[in-house]
């Protein structure tokens, strides 16, 4: 397997997005729209998407292979279903398609599995199993386990990174920020102190079919967001203070005054 840096993967994602934008169905769009994984997979990459129950506990979200192979699918009645993957097909868990709350996970899983095919197209001699007489590699996308910060599977990590680049390419994010009135850079994303900016970023995330968390991380990655305080909305200029129990403050000015009182005394 070829080991790629994040910057290398982002460059691949940009190339794929450029080709995607030239597709007839996409080129005629005038407004900023979310990347459509189905058009990307079928019209650009020549892949086919099918839906099946992939496991009894539904913890396998997707599977694919860049070569022809038969895969055994487990059904609820414990019956085994033999499915033939032809090297151009991506299987997605049916429940992801049916549940509207899993729409984001469904989009990501499609692009994750498609990423394996993109790497195979770009690096045919370094990716997958090329030895005759040995079955091709079967890729699985599973329910994520607790993150430890340690990469244990570089192949799946690279597929995750490319999937993120395909769904939120830098060019699309910049265009969306300009269109929605965020300018070239957001100084601080904080729902308490910067509610107007937060509302715009949240609207942009919905436009791009993303969560606000994923969009904020992408913006920060590309230097489009200075301070990401989604998980720290009560941090005032990066300084922390104790919030009394059963606090009902809603006005940022009250929080600011509490910070000033705690730091400098009630007379300030």
Please give the residue ranges for each predicted region:
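Active-site hotspot residues in diverse enzymes, especially metal/ion-binding acidic/histidine motifs
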Residues: 1-268
């Amino acid at each position: 397997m070829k080991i790629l840096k994040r910057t290398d993967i982002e460059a691949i994602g940009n190339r794929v997005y450029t080709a995607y934008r030239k597709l007839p169905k996409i080129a005629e769009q005038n407004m900023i729209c979310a990347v459509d994984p189905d058009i990307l997979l079928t019209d650009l990459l020549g892949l086919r998407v099918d839906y099946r129950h992939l496991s009894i506990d539904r913890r396998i979200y997707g599977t694919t292979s860049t070569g022809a192979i038969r895969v055994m699918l487990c059904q609820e009645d414990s019956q085994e279903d033999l499915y033939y993957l032809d090297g151009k097909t991506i299987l997605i868990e049916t429940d992801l398609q049916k549940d509207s709350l899993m729409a984001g996970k469904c989009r990501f899983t499609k692009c994750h599995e498609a990423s394996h095919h993109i790497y195979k197209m770009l690096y045919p001699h370094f990716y997958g199993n090329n030895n005759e007489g040995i079955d091709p590699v079967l890729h699985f996308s599973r329910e994520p386990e607790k993150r430890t910060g340690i990469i244990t599977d570089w192949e799946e990590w690279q597929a995750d990174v490319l999937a993120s680049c395909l769904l939120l390419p830098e060019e699309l994010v910049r265009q969306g920020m300009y269109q929605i009135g965020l300018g070239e850079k957001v100084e601080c994303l904080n729902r308490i102190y910067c509610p107007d900016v937060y509302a715009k970023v949240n609207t942009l995330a919905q436009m791009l079919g993303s969560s606000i968390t994923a969009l904020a991380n992408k913006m920060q990655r590309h230097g489009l967001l200075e301070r990401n305080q989604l998980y720290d909305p009560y941090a005032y200029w990066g300084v922390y203070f104790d919030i009394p129990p059963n606090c009902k403050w809603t006005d940022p000015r009250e929080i600011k005054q509490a910070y000033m009182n705690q730091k400098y005394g009630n007379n300030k």
